[in-house]
Amino acid sequence: MRKQTIYNVILCSVLSLYTSFSAYAQSEIAFTNKVTYTKTGSISGVRLVSLMPAPITNEYQEISELASNCGEFISINKANKVLFYDGPFNNNSSDVTESFMYKSKPIRIDFSKTENKNEVTGIDPNGYLGSDGTFIDLSNTTIVNTGDQLWAESSNKLDYAKRCYEYVASHYRYINGSWRTLAQIISIGGGECGDFATLFVNLMRYKGIPARHNMGVWKDGGYHVWPDFYHEDYGWIPVDPTFKNSNPGADYFGRYDGNLIILSQGLTSFTSGDINIEEVPLQTFYYWYWYQSGNGGVDGVHKTSKDYLVNGINSVKTNIETVGTILNLNGMKLPHLKRGINIINGKKVFVK
């Protein structure tokens, strides 16, 4: 082969503004997750390698009827599975698709009770204590100083975790963008949902408390990442510092409302032949390609059911109401709305 090109793609984790915490709670839905690959130029003799996360049943969801149109599902550990395709790419456009049934498992941790732990048998929490030096760097000066300060103020591990959650939410700004390293997050003073999760996970692991990222897609479209941590009395405890940052008056500690399809937990390592990734967030997909002749490349686009299926449109009613603050269905304040008509929670909102 004349030329080798490698592409890694991780899409920005953006917070969906159209998701209801309660509309689909504990309901089962059919869902499709796919990547569309398209050739550009006139290349031929193409080998395509595609790697995308595949959901499994865990603390927050039940997955059944998992199927794909190509490739194979590979379990890389007890918490994560991937759909891996390695083969020819002969057409100008081709999809790698996985479909499944999804049922949410909303969680509210009752801290007055310890008899029902939120955990899945077989997943060792100690697997979420390590440091990769990029996303997780337990020697980072800011993490060390902040962690020591909050630990000194805390009465126990649970108190420390809540202080970390509140600290991240109140001391960092929400800044749009793609995944950042820990050093980049601290340097710019904030980040998006994945970055808020990274800060929390680092603070927890620094004190020997297992913690991880939960990465996925909203059932109604968009991406989100939030962390959880392990406590010996309660199991895995979900928190969302991003939501807390946007809505400081609400409480997202020990609460998961069941509206996210989790595609992977923690950072992912994967090796197959000449393909290797080490400790990376796998939320959407990675791909690589090689070609024998011609000029051009291969583009990849991630899509979910919401991106290309329309299940009908409800009739529209006009209802004019004057309000000072506009919230999404997650109870989060919506800043930076445009003057004119905005579509919020399926309604037209006019901003003067």
Please annotate each region the language model reported.
Residues M1-I10:
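Bacterial N-terminal signal peptides that target proteins for export
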Residues V9-S20:
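Bacterial N-terminal signal peptides
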Residues A25-I107:
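Intrinsically disordered, low-complexity N-terminal segments that are enriched in acidic
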Residues F100-I188, L199, E279-L309:
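Secondary-structure boundary elements
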Residues E153-D233, N247-A250, R255-I261:
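Active-site neighborhood of thiol-dependent amide/isopeptide-bond enzymes
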Residues D220-L309:
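Active-site rim recognition segments
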Residues L309-N330:
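Residue-level detector of functionally pivotal "anchor" positions at catalytic/ligand-binding pockets or at interdomain
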Residues I341-K352:
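C-terminal tail/sorting-segment detector
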